Design a protein with these regions (language model features):
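C-terminal regulatory/oligomerization modules of transcriptional regulators
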Residues: 1, 125-151
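N-terminal leader segment of winged-helix/HTH proteins
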Residues: 1-30, 77
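Pre-recognition alpha-helix immediately N-terminal to the DNA-recognition helix
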Residues: 11, 38-42, 102, 129
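Short, locally clustered residues in the helix-turn-helix/winged-helix DNA-binding domain
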Residues: 13, 41-48, 108, 135
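Alpha-helical linker/hinge and terminal dimerization helices associated
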Residues: 15, 19, 60, 103-119, ...
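N-terminal helix-turn-helix DNA-binding core of bacterial DNA-binding proteins
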Residues: 22-66, 146-149
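Charged, amphipathic alpha-helical coiled-coil/dimerization segments
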Residues: 72-135
């Protein structure tokens, strides 16, 4: 087996695991997980918009069952609530509760600490290149995923 063939994806998996571990450790005091953080972050960035489970699935790249579980746990913690769409009772909108909105400052602090650790030792130019390359790699992988969904 040629280790060079697996180097990039192996490093990406290790980086993802390390980042999730770091964020879960930081989020433990709030009773949240990294996946729950992503949903709350998305809702904080889209206050006033009609966000559904389907939107969260699409925008966060998560499965229906994963989103359903996250939303149930966030509802149980009174961080979000769900309001049924009056024109389509099969659909519900998700929004942050006052308790969820109150998490914004703490979550921003965790995001900044994560970013600081992730970019430690990089110059501003290297950090910008790193972000640009990560965005390109993610776009490449998302295009393959989107093509598979359409097939």
């Amino acid at each position: 087996m040629d280790a060079e063939l697996y180097r990039t994806s192996g490093q990406m998996i290790k980086l993802s695991d390390a980042l999730i571990w770091f964020r879960n450790r930081e989020l433990d005091a709030l009773g949240l997980t990294s996946s729950q953080f992503e949903v709350v972050r998305y809702l904080l960035l889209h206050i006033g918009e009609e966000v559904t489970a389907g939107v969260l699935m699409r925008e966060l790249g998560l499965s229906q069952s994963t989103v359903a579980g996250i939303l149930k746990r966030l509802c149980d913690k009174c961080i979000i609530d769900r309001r049924q769409d009056e024109s389509d009772t099969r659909r519900s909108f998700v929004r942050l509760t006052p308790k969820g909105l109150a998490l914004e400052e703490e979550l921003q602090g965790i995001a900044l600490r994560s970013e600081d650790v992730l970019l430690r030792g990089m110059t501003e130019a290297e950090a910008a290149d790193f972000y640009r390359l990560l965005s390109l790699a993610l776009s490449n992988m998302n295009s393959v995923r989107d093509e598979a969904r359409e097939a």
